[in-house]
A protein has these predicted regions:
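Short aromatic-enriched loop/helix-cap "lid" or pocket-rim segments at secondary-structure transitions
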Residues: 12, 56-60, 113-114
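Short alpha-helix
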Residues: 75-104
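Short conserved loop adjoining the S-adenosyl-L-methionine
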Residues: 3-10
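Conserved class I S-adenosyl-L-methionine
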Residues: 43-72
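A conserved beta-strand element that flanks and buttresses the S-adenosyl-L-methionine
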Residues: 16
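Core SAM-dependent methyltransferase catalytic element
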Residues: 95-96, 107-137
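A short His-aromatic
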Residues: 19-23
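A short glycine-rich, Lys/Arg-flanked "PGG" loop and its adjoining helix->strand segment in the class I
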Residues: 28-43
């Protein structure tokens, strides 16, 4: 299931995208749209579980792969550090974001067997608008 962000005509000083990128079918398109929602000095706060293991939720609890793949450097990263660096240099910067801060934070998910709680690593990125996007639409 995909929902589009409505065109509001407004921009915002702060936009958050918390644990959504790995669950959406078009993560690059979502990031482009979120960038459009920022004021020139606005901040985008992105949290994503790493290493990158996307699973788009479908009806009846089924999952599928995203229709839009992130670069190989992100998909192949095995550690938190590799994943965070790959997201910064292969995704956020080419989309026209400056990475201001990265932090490792715990994320508790009910994604384990039988709904058990699993402790994961979230990469929390503080992004601002930088140079124009170099990734084709």
């Amino acid at each position: 299931m995909q929902a589009e962000l409505p065109a509001t005509g407004f921009t915002h000083d702060l936009v958050t995208c918390l644990n959504v990128l790995d669950r959406t079918s078009r993560p690059l398109a979502l990031l482009r749209r979120l960038r459009e929602l920022l004021t020139p000095s606005g901040v985008l706060l992105v949290a994503v579980v790493v290493p990158w293991r996307p699973a788009v939720l479908q009806r009846a609890g089924l999952t599928s792969a995203p229709s839009e793949a992130l670069p190989a450097a992100v998909r192949e990263a095995a550690t938190f550090e590799q994943s965070a660096a790959a997201l910064a240099t292969s995704v956020f910067e080419p989309l026209g974001f400056d990475v201001r801060r990265v932090s490792r934070v715990p994320y508790l998910s009910r994604g384990g067997p039988r709904g058990s709680i699993v402790a994961l690593d979230d990469a929390l990125f503080v992004l601002t608008k930088g140079a124009t996007s170099t990734v084709p639409k």
